[in-house]
């Protein structure tokens, strides 16, 4: 691992030398070549065939019910493969088995990391399988966050994919900065999809801002490399949209979810493979997230999405739009249905099962705090729309709350109507805009209200529906 240590995850550079050396030593033990790889008598052709078979095997899904021993073996095999790719003397002269291979490897690598972390947390919390708990206790770094992040960052650094993407943005030749490794398809594609992998891992760990920051050098458009692989396309927009939702940028989240759902609906007749079929099963999750975002930020949706949303979550959406305590269980249900399977960045405490907090429950709690803050928003706005000026105490009487509590809520809500909206640069950047059609200002106890309604574009509506009728 020392050969590509500079590619390790950010924020770990300040660790003590002793701790770093321990991690390096532990990692080296875990990435030894499989038996026979160092045999000098093995022919070059036999070695090449063995590596090719390992490349193919790395992209194959692991059975969900695989025993713990198999999960450990899978981790060792991944470590061995990435060690060979990253630490060989010079770039490995191999071509990927297929165009989709690099994505499949990164996708499966992160899936197994996610699955193992969830399994380990479940064993620790249940405390009813002492044998497996002891094995997991003795191997805390197997499928650890440090190892997984280090592999992804190392693949990105070795391939110099960030430099290549930056050169492409400047309309320069990316091969001029690719180097010996980045000029080869194997490294370039692994490095590129490792960026998407980092987006996913940081989101699973709950660092949503860093997740968005990882895509600074990737342009979200149809020409991007990830858009050529349907599963990568779907995954990218799902995690970007979810990260936006968790940092309260609901307009941008709706934009991301809408893009991929419309794309899926328009291409379903052209793609008939197992990968596509598995993606379409996740559409309900995306619709559930859109329902949540629309409740926070009412907006017009594409007709296709609006129709699907009404069919799948019509009753729930109505409760969300009404607000109040009745909406809380609906928010919780939709969030559990559609959120990623969050993981903890550290191994669980097997000796104190009750001290382990379920990561999903933790993020649900954070999300529900935001929901409770906005719970009365629909009711308050329904009153404000009826007036141009209104006394604070009068509105407080309608809502049966104390005037000062209402004042605090109005100030917080007004602040949150100002949101960043992504335009063109980094995903965390954007223009500060008012995302609500209802605005108000407070002068002492007097509330001044203004409403800006955008007229419906009937011409566009007629054209869309006429094209559906006659096409």
Swiss-Prot record:
Component of the eukaryotic translation initiation factor 3 (eIF-3) complex, which is involved in protein synthesis of a specialized repertoire of mRNAs and, together with other initiation factors, stimulates binding of mRNA and methionyl-tRNAi to the 40S ribosome. The eIF-3 complex specifically targets and initiates translation of a subset of mRNAs involved in cell proliferation. GO terms for cellular component: eukaryotic 43S preinitiation complex; eukaryotic 48S preinitiation complex; eukaryotic translation initiation factor 3 complex. InterPro entries: eIF3l (IPR019382), PCI_dom (IPR000717). Keywords: Cytoplasm, Initiation factor, Protein biosynthesis. Belongs to the eIF-3 subunit L family. GO terms for molecular function: translation initiation factor activity. The keyword Cytoplasm applies. It comes from Pyricularia oryzae (strain 70-15 / ATCC MYA-4617 / FGSC 8958). It is found in: Cytoplasm. It holds the Pfam family Paf67. The lineage of its organism: Eukaryota, Fungi, Dikarya, Ascomycota, Pezizomycotina. Component of the eukaryotic translation initiation factor 3 (eIF-3) complex. It comes from the Eukaryota. This is Eukaryotic translation initiation factor 3 subunit L. Residues 252-446 form the PCI domain. PANTHER family: EUKARYOTIC TRANSLATION INITIATION FACTOR 3, EUKARYOTIC TRANSLATION INITIATION FACTOR 3 SUBUNIT L. GO terms for biological process: formation of cytoplasmic translation initiation complex.
């Amino acid at each position: 691992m020392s050969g590509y240590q500079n590619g390790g995850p950010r924020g770990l550079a300040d660790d003590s030398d002793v701790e770093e050396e321990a991690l390096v030593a532990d990692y080296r033990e875990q990435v030894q070549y499989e038996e026979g790889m160092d045999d000098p008598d093995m022919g070059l052709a036999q070695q090449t065939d063995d590596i090719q078979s390992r490349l193919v095997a790395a992209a194959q899904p692991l059975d969900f019910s695989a025993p713990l021993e198999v999960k450990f073996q899978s981790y060792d095999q991944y470590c061995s493969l990435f060690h060979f790719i990253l630490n060989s003397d010079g770039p490995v002269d191999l071509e990927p088995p297929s165009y989709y291979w690099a994505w499949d490897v990164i996708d499966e690598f992160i899936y197994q990391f996610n699955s193992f972390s969830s399994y380990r947390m479940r064993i620790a919390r249940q405390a009813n399988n002492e044998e497996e708990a002891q094995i997991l206790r003795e191997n805390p770094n197997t499928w650890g966050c440090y190892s997984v992040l280090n592999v992804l960052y190392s693949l990105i650094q070795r391939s110099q994919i960030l430099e290549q993407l930056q050169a492409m943005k400047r309309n320069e030749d990316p091969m001029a900065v690719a180097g010996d490794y980045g000029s080869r398809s194997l490294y370039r594609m692994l490095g590129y999809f490792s960026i998407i992998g980092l987006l996913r891992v940081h989101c699973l760990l709950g660092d949503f801002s860093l997740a968005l920051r990882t895509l600074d050098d990737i342009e979200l458009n149809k020409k991007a490399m990830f858009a050529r692989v349907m599963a990568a396309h779907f995954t990218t927009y799902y995690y970007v949209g979810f990260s936006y939702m968790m940092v309260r940028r609901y307009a941008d989240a709706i934009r991301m979810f809408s893009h991929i759902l419309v794309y899926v609906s328009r291409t379903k007749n052209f793609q008939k493979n197992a990968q596509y079929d598995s993606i379409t099963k996740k559409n309900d999750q995306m619709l559930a997230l859109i329902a949540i975002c629309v409740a926070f930020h009412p907006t017009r949706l594409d007709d296709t999405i609006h129709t699907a949303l009404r069919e799948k979550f019509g009753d729930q959406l109505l409760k969300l739009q009404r607000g109040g305590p009745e909406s809380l269980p609906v928010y919780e249900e939709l969030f559990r249905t559609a959120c990623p399977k969050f993981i903890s960045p550290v191994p669980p405490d097997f000796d104190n099962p009750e001290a382990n907090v379920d990561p999903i429950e933790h993020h649900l709690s954070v999300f529900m705090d935001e929901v409770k803050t906005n719970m009365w928003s629909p009711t308050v706005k329904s009153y404000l729309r009826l007036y141009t000026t209104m006394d604070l105490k009068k509105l407080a009487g309608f809502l049966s709350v104390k005037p000062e509590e209402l004042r605090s809520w109005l100030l917080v809500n007004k602040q949150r109507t100002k949101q960043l909206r992504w335009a063109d640069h980094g995903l965390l950047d954007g223009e500060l805009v008012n995302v609500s059609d209802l605005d108000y200002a407070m002068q002492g106890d007097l509330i001044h209200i203004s409403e800006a309604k955008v007229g419906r574009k009937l011409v566009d509506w007629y054209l869309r529906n006429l094209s559906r009728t006659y096409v």
